[in-house]
Amino acid sequence: MLFRSGVHYAVEVMVKDNCVMLGGEVKGSVDMSDIETYVKNALREIGYDEHYSDIWKNYAIDVRHIEVINKIGVQSADINQGVEHDGWGDQGVFVGYACKGPALINRELWLARKLNDALYEHAKTSSNLGLDIKTQITIDDATGDIVTAIVAIPMLEPEDIKPFVVDALGTQPKSIIVNGTGIYQFHSSIADCGITGRKLACDFYSTACP
């Protein structure tokens, strides 16, 4: 779809347990006959492959048992006439604007993403750490110091990752909290249903502007 002129597509994805549901509208010639293979390959690409399933078993989504529900239809002619000529569409509203700081986003979000990326790459080579990682950074506005670094990362067995957190951030936070609720083993869509729009809104600016 990315390389086909004139194609419009608005597709949402919802994942729960081992079920992936695709819903939305498409205008143009798009071959969706092998959509199940595409979905499974996308899961493998982000790390949820057969090897991962062998390690985590029932704790995470299993690419070998994926059910794909395809509810992608044809774009409404009423909507298309506005999109085609005037650019109208129902795309929702996201908050956020460029600000002074790394990557033109607020420093807390930048550091949280940096830490998340580092942990994700580390987890991909680990037989104990999972890929469903959440991070949050709190900064003292007066000093710029990191007050708290919070990490939620699946672990089959307890593991001290605080030294890795410090190394990834390049500084020692006053407090590091890892899996503060206790055990974190069930993860991915097995534990938390994911919907495209909700996840994107959180990823852009965490619904708040600096």
Segments (PLM) and residue ranges:
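Glycine-rich, mobile lid/loop segments that gate access to catalytic sites or pores
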Residues: 9, 17-20, 30, 37, ...
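Conserved mixed alpha/beta catalytic, RNA-binding, or beta-rich assembly cores of soluble enzyme
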Residues: 93, 166, 184-189, 193-210
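Cofactor-binding beta-sheet edge motifs in enzyme active sites
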Residues: 13
